[in-house]
Amino acid sequence: MKLLYVYETRVGTFFIGQSPDGRFHPVFDGESLGSYLSPQHATDDLAGGHTFSPAGGFDTATLGIPEDISEWDTVK
């Protein structure tokens, strides 16, 4: 999976990656939290707490993750 976007939170780093099939995945601690048609859909669901639960069981909606992909940094 190619990591494209990154956002730091108090619990760790989240990424938006793209798999070889062209789908986009919110990723935390190396684990995909879902599969989406666009990076914007991935960040919308991650910010709203509508993805698979990350290891640790915390609610991503409480972390201040922005819905707008333009507020994320690009992976260099």
Report residues per predicted region.
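N-terminal leader/targeting segments and the first structural element of proteins
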Residues: 1-2
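Mixed-charge, Lys/Arg-enriched low-complexity segments
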Residues: 33-76
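Short aromatic-glycine-(Arg/Gly/Cys) micro-motifs in beta-strand/loop hairpins
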Residues: 6-32
